[in-house]
Amino acid sequence: MAGAGPAPGLPGAGGPVVPGPGAGIPGKSGEERLKEMEAEMALFEQEVLGAPVTGIPTAVPAVPTVPTVEAMQVPAAPVIRPIIATNTYQQVQQTLEARAAAAATVVPPMVGGPPFVGPVGFGPGDRSHLDSPEAREAMFLRRAAAGPRPMALRPPHQALVGPPLPGPPGPPMMLPPMARAPGPPLGSMAALRPPLEEPATPRELGLGLGLGLKEKEEAVVAAAAGLEEASAVVAVGAGGAPAGPAVIGPSLPLALAMPLPEPEPLPLPLEVVRGLLPPLRIPELLSLRPRPRPPRPEPPPGLMALEVPEPLSEDKKKGKPEKLKRCIRTAAGSSWEDPSLLEWDADDFRIFCGDLGNEVNDDILARAFSRFPSFLKAKVIRDKRTGKTKGYGFVSFKDPSDYVRAMREMNGKYVGSRPIKLRKSMWKDRNLDVVRKKQKEKKKLGLR
């Protein structure tokens, strides 16, 4: 790609700036391009780690002038290095972020929540380095990689053995080749790689659910070993497509980017419970439920419960003959029992009907008085031996008003072949209890 304008170059170790009017990047020697890449990577590392920037923008092929950078110069290595592979930039960026996470332990740790999206060392007031294409590319890659980040916590233990699986193709592959800053040589990757033997912080160790401190350190070392193997494969396949799986785009620190193992303590409580509670103890627990019942059968209430139903049953037995009241009648100095009075209602209003013909029966007498609403019963008295009528009967009413109307309207009316004669029934006066009561009252009054 030949530049139309002057293409500046970054100075090497004490070398002057090479202005080239009309000269493009292909005209530069290998050492100059190497110096430019090393300077850019050093500047990018400084921005990522949050170190103060000297205000020198990164060299871009279309910028007319670039000030000299003395503090960021790195001595050129005379050794000829292999061509940078397509995945080298992403690999170096991953290692830089791992180092930034290790250095960020001094800063107040970030409370657990959504994954970190912005650059590591950017502050709210420092926005001067956001204009560089490297910073914008890193921010874009982090935002693109932040979407499927929660899914990285679900894979099982297999992810602890090898390097992380490659994610979806990121946007850097769609950018023009020169838009991305060329990565440093492979020799500088070893210098920029953070020490993998450092113990993880307590906050990172606490992310494991069922692992202890030693198990967490072993998992971090295993993941780091897998990362070194992946970088070695990338170095062997330089000049072509990446020979091994590699992560495209930035990732979280090793302890955070590692997929957490499955929580092992979850099935343990069930096994422990099953082991501690043998099948012989389960019915014992079930038998504890009816224990509150013993307070009920206390000695005094129990005796009362046994004694109470007996008198109740005796009362019922005694009450049955009491219900069958004996209706003892008395008249003319003699007494007899009349069970027929039990067929009548004790609270009714009864009328005596006399001078009935032989043809009058209960139905005829009831038909004659049934026009009154509160009519209850009508009966003709007959001889028990012959069955002939004795010439009289009784009619009862529930309402006293109907009783009075029947006395007025039905007295002297024909029922059958004869007119009947009505008067008030005196059946209560012939009751033995009533007779004795009246006799006592007469004695008190001195009548007898």
Swiss-Prot record:
Assembly and oligomerization: Interacts with HNRNPK.
Chief location bin: nucleus
Entry-annotated residues carrying Phosphoserine: 132
Function, as annotated: Binds (via the RRM domain) to the 3'-untranslated region (UTR) of CDKN1A mRNA.
Lineage summary: Eukaryota, Metazoa, Chordata, Craniata, Vertebrata
Keywords: Acetylation, Cytoplasm, Methylation, Nucleus, Phosphoprotein, RNA-binding
PTM sites of type N-acetylalanine: 2
Location within or outside the cell: Nucleus; Cytoplasm
Pfam families associated with the record: RRM_1
Domain spans labelled RRM: 349-427
Molecular function in Gene Ontology: mRNA binding
Matches recorded under Gene3D superfamilies: 3.30.70.330
Basic and acidic residues compositional bias, start-end: 313-324
Modified residues annotated as Asymmetric dimethylarginine in this record: 149
SMART domains found in the cross-reference section: RRM
Protein name: RNA-binding protein 42
Region (Disordered): 1-29, 286-324
Similarity section: Belongs to the RRM RBM42 family.
Entry GO terms, CC: cytoplasm; nucleus
Region of interest: Necessary for interaction with HNRNPK: 204-448
Species assigned in the record: Bos taurus
Domain of life: Eukaryota
Comp. bias (Gly residues): 11-27
